[in-house]
Curated annotation (Swiss-Prot):
Domain of life (superkingdom): Eukaryota
Cell compartment(s), UniProt: Nucleus
Ranges of Low complexity composition bias in the record: 537-562
Name of protein: Transcription factor GTE7
BP terms from Gene Ontology: DNA-mediated transformation
Organism, scientific name: Arabidopsis thaliana
Domain Bromo residue range list: 164-270
Amino acid sequence: MAPAVFATLNEPSYQEQCGAVFMRKFTNQSVTENTNNLPLFNPNPNPNFERSNSSKQCDDSSEFGSYATFNLAGYTSSQLRELKKRFTSELKQIRILRERIESGTFETQQGYTIPEVPAVRSAPLNNFTGEKNDLGPKKKKQKKNVSGLKRSNQFGPSDPESEKLLAGMLNTCSQILVKLMKHKWAWVFNTPVDVVGLGLHDYHQVVKKPMDLGTVKLNLDKGFYVSPIDFATDVRLTFDNAMTYNPKGQDVYFMADKLLDHFDGMFNPAFKKFEAQQLKLTGSSSRPEPDFKPDFKQRQWNQNPPMVANPRKGTEQISIAKKLDSVKPPQPTLPPQLVEPSRVQSPSPPPPPPVIQPELPQPQPPPPQLEIEVEAPPDVSEVSKGRKGKLPKPKAKDPNKRLMTMEEKSKLGMNLQDLPPEKLGQLLQILRKRNGHLAQDGDEIELDIEAVDNETLWELDRFVTNYKKMASKIKRQGFIRNVSTPPRNMASVAEMGSAEKRTRRGDAGEEDVDIGEDIPIEDYPSVEIERDGTAVAAAASSGSSSSGSSSSSGGSSSSSDSGSGGSSSGSDSDADSVQSPFVEAKEAQC
């Protein structure tokens, strides 16, 4: 519409200068239907003016986009002011309509009425106040119909009790959001992401629908959420966007993960309580509500694919795994070593339940490690470590051996250090089969266990395992032999004890004590001492030579001579008699 120009209307020469004629564009209704009622201020009216003017305007009214003519010479100052106000209000309405169309809020839906631009009437100016009163109800109607833009209520037919319950739940959602925004890590998510300021040029390519807690609070305050599900969806979308754009391990990812768990811990109990009250209020037969709860859970879990892929997410997913494990038989969770014997025991599992029931209790008394695996502790890393430690070792003929874990490598390195020196030759042969580049510094070889290939690592593991088995077997056989062999020559031992008692009753001044030389020769090996090219051999049964005489109190006695002759008293020559270690120990005790 072409706006009319109003300037210096109160000047006396204004009407003569401008010709007192203004035009405006015609809209959708005839503006000349009440032209006859306008008062004529021309003292010399033209009798043909009314007929020709009306006929011309009637011709214009048949065309859209024509112009309506206003003869400003026939209006007083007050009427011109009213006309100016009228044009100003129409212009304001057109601008508002244009802004709504450009912003996209102008939609035509069922139950929504597009506000029509009020028709411009050339009625008597004294009726302008009546037209203003007509505009009032239309504006109220417009505001009332705008509510049709909201999403439909998913909680069935509206009634006062249901609306009151829903309002209470939305109030609880508002309280949960306030607590969440006051968290010490929530400052990252309270405002929209500053893509330009942070230089995140690919943010909108990765995140298709940005969301933040501040926007969620604004939408909640304006009443855009008609159900708690929509509110929870936007809150979860905020944290999902952060975990989608930021890789795992960064601070933002960790903060979003913890805040999402914190939100679920507050929202899920409140929503379950709301569902129970809703079902109690309406009844299961009044509306198809049973499909709502699984739909909500499906939306809740399908909306967070990273949480299922990255074991990110923690506590709720592990609890679901617990429920599945408790429902299913515990046989699939056992390691392969335990599953295979059970298959051998039951080659043909019969279908009747009485036969299946005895099979279920068999895996129930497993070692304690199996109980930890079934219980699934909250820390996902601990579960993964426990499962990795229970992996079976590959066989030697297996072409595709699994990679050795870090725990197994460290254990292998400790076992290699405990090998005796006689096994190092075989160890070097195994290493040089596939690793000829090992650097050798004299007798030492530097071995980096991380640089050794997987095949060699498993061969070294088998070598160490076989050695440990052999060593434990030898030790076990020696222990059994010592326990099963009875003590030999019990009589000689008794005689030795009696002889020792008799010698102690004798002269206590003698330093050398004869304890009886009845100990069997086979119990102690011969001792050879090389000195000055001469070898002196003394049997373990020989006693100490003292004062040139060798006597035996218990029977046969023999004194070992040195290579040159008999023993003489008080001689300190190299050919002195050699005492057995057993005799020396007894002398030291005395």
